[in-house]
Amino acid sequence: MNIRPDQNRLVFSADTLKIDEAAEADRIVAGLRAQLRSLRKRGLVLGLSGGIDSSVSVALAVRAVGAKNVFCLFMPENDSDPESLRLGRLVAETFGVEAVVEDIGPTLDAMGCYQRRDAFIRELVPDYGPGWASKIVIANALEGDGYNISSLVVQDPEGKQTKLRMPPSVYLGIVAATNMKQRTRKQIEYYHADRLNFAVLGTPNRLEYDQGFFVKNGDGAADVKPIAHLYKSQVYALAGHLGIPEEIRRRPPTTDTYSLEQTQEEFYFSLPYDRMDLCLFGLNNGLSADEVGRAANLGVAQVKRVWADIAAKRKATRYLHLGPQLVQPVEEIE
C-alpha cells in the first residue's frame, strides 16, 4: 500500500482491500469449527449454485470438517441456467463432497410460483405465456438522484424485448412469487441438515449481506455465514488461494432466478462488484467521495449517488436482518 508522506495515511485503491488469503482462510476455518462445536453439529449442508460465493464456502467447509462431513445440494428449477448445475458439479468433484440434485421445479409449480408470477406480468403484458421470458432490472444509480426504480423486461417468442415500468403492486407480486424459489431451497437444505445433524451454511458476501440482497427465511436463513465479512473482491482473491476452478472465477456474478439472463448489477447493485466494494469500503471507513472516486474511476457526484443508494437499501432491508420481534423479552432465554 502507498503512504502519503504529507498526511501519513494510506492512498485508497483496490489494493487497500487486499487480504492475506492463507491467514484469512485459516481464520474462517477455525471460526467454523468453533461455531459447529457451539451448535453441537457434525458437519455442514449448503446449496451449491456454481457461483463464486458458494464455491468458496464449499472449499472452506471441507477444510473445516473434511469432505465426508459436507453435504451439497443442486436445486435447479424451471428458469435455471443449465450452466449453474454443470459448474456446481465441477466444484463438488473438485473438493470431493457428496452432492445430490433436488429439482424444485415441480414443487414450485404445485405451489403456483410460476402461475402467480405470470398473472402479475399479464397485468402489463396480456399476451405473456409459454415461450415468453422476463426479468426485473433497475435504473442506473449513477445517472440521477433518488431511488432506483425497477422495470420489467419481457421477451416474446420471436426474441423481441420490451421494457416496462411497473406499478408497486405488480413489482411486489412478481418478487413475492419469485421468493418462493429461495424459500423452497432453504426448506430442502434444512431437511438434509436435520437428518444428518449438520448445520446449514449460508453464503452471502459482505456486499450482499450489507445491502440486503437475500430473501428473508430463504437464502438469508442459515446457522453460519462464514464469508459475510468479506467484500466480494476479497472472496475472489480467496477463491484463487483455495483452488476454485478458473472457469468459475471468470464467470460474472448472476442471479439465475429469472427466465431471462440477468446480472446482479442490472438487478440490484449500481455498479460491478469491484467498484461497489470500493464505494462500500469508503463509506464504511469515512473516506471522502473524492478519494473513493479516484479509486473507483467515478466522479464525486456519482460516488455520492452510490452512497445514497447504499443508505436507502440499508434502510429498506433492515427488517431482513431482524428476528421475530417480541412485545416483551423472555429473559430466561435471552
Curated annotation (Swiss-Prot):
GO terms for molecular function: ATP binding; glutaminase activity; metal ion binding; NAD+ synthase (glutamine-hydrolyzing) activity; NAD+ synthase activity. Gene3D superfamilies: HUPs. Mg(2+) binds at residues 53, 208. Deamido-NAD(+) binds at residues 183, 216, 223. Keywords: ATP-binding, Ligase, Magnesium, Metal-binding, NAD, Nucleotide-binding, Plasmid. It catalyses: deamido-NAD(+) + NH4(+) + ATP = AMP + diphosphate + NAD(+) + H(+). Its EC number is 6.3.1.5. GO terms for biological process: NAD biosynthetic process. Pathway: Cofactor biosynthesis; NAD(+) biosynthesis; NAD(+) from deamido-NAD(+) (ammonia route): step 1/1. GO terms for cellular component: cytoplasm. ATP binds at residues 47-54, 203, 232, 254. InterPro entries: NAD/GMP_synthase (IPR022310), NAD_synthase (IPR003694), NH(3)-dep_NAD(+)_synth (IPR022926), Rossmann-like_a/b/a_fold (IPR014729). Homodimer. PANTHER family: GLUTAMINE-DEPENDENT NAD(+) SYNTHETASE, NH 3 /GLUTAMINE-DEPENDENT NAD + SYNTHETASE. Catalyzes the ATP-dependent amidation of deamido-NAD to form NAD. Uses ammonia as a nitrogen source. Belongs to the NAD synthetase family. This is NH(3)-dependent NAD(+) synthetase. The gene is nadE.
